[in-house]
UniProtKB/Swiss-Prot annotation:
Cytoplasmic topological segments: 88-103, 203-413
Keywords: Membrane, Peroxisome, Transmembrane, Transmembrane helix
PANTHER family hit by this protein: PEROXISOMAL MEMBRANE PROTEIN PEX30-RELATED, PEROXISOMAL MEMBRANE PROTEIN PEX32
Membrane association type: Multi-pass membrane protein
Name assigned to this protein: Peroxisomal membrane protein PEX32
Classification via InterPro entries: Peroxin/Ferlin, Peroxisomal_PEX28-32, TECPR1-like_DysF
One BP annotation, GO: peroxisome organization
Membrane-spanning residues: 67-87, 104-124, 182-202
SMART domains: DysFC, DysFN
Listed Pfam families: Pex24p
Amino acid sequence: MDTNSKTKVQTENKKIKAKFIHNHGQKPSLIQITPPMISSTLFHAYPLLLIFDNALANIMWLSDDKCLTFIYLTSIWLTISFFIPVETEASHFLPFTKILRLWLGIISGAFLFLSFMYYIVSLIASLRDTEPPTLDEIVVLLESVLDKLEVLRNELNVWKKLKLSFDGVNKECSGKRLFCRLFLFGTIFQIIIMRYISPGTYTRFFIITGLIYNTSSFQATLRLLWRFTAVRNFYYLGIESFKISSFLPKHLKMEQIIPLSQGRAITVPLVEVLPKLLRDKKGDDHIHILQLLLNEQKDNFGNEDLKILEIEVYENQRRWYQNKNWSTKLLPYERQNYCIEIKNTDGTLTMRSCLPPDGLGEEELPNNWHWINDNWDGTDWIYSDSAWKEIGQYSSLESFTRSRKWKRRLFHL
């Protein structure tokens, strides 16, 4: 056999093995960085974490066995009916109904208790027969429990959800105003309900509603109802009543905007600001500005101050699902197409509807106010989601609303 043939045979008999080069530092094991006392505590708490995680999964309808969760729900309903009876009219079948409700309540309560005990016993037996969990598995289970608790905390924090919703619609909503409206609305709503529904039925309704809140059917129903404008108006009840005073018109004009915006005006010496006023003026504009100042009939302009106010008008648009173009049609409870930010007496800000910038520029200014800029200066669009939460300066699939500012300055001597 020649040399080339021998080399070829040796090459074919060789096995090719992949060699991985780790150029980056690997994550250290949790066993090496976790103190022994914490590791021991987590190991002993592992069965409790499993029980708690399974209970949260059933409450949030995350279990794979939906039928078992429905059986639990039915048993809870029958048990609640035993402890919270419903007032019924007297009839010949009333004793039989009470006995049936008593029997079903006891059986359902016993079923829930025995089912829970059977799960605990089977879990302990399973943990004895299997290998002990690693620290990584315990940490993953702990993170799962914390994530579920975080979801439940956000769902139960009704105040925060309403506050964020109202802030997105009306820029900023004070906690005091929100509490007053929720208290008044909630009190009237409770009185109406308690007039026609017994306390037992009322309590059972809220308990069962809380238990089925996370089901896919309930969430799908809420999403379908949210598509109706009447439902959204009912949810945001009271937003349109956030007004400075009741006598203000629907669309603010310059004669209302200037007094309401006086708090943002700045006062500067006339000698310092006059060159800046005349800097960008050409031709007859110089004469016009000087004539406006001379018409004030001031003897000594050197000691006079000039009040400058900047007006900011927000232009808002929305994009609907059936149309890819941006539209000026907005929902009734949210911002108007053109609005201005007004400061309330308690320090909060309110968005009030106003005329378009072109319409405001054509109006006659009150109290010897005069425009500094000849035209309105517009900013770039700021894109937001459906709740007017800012996303960025570029349009995306998540952006359904957008807003920009139109600015123009005035002066008053």
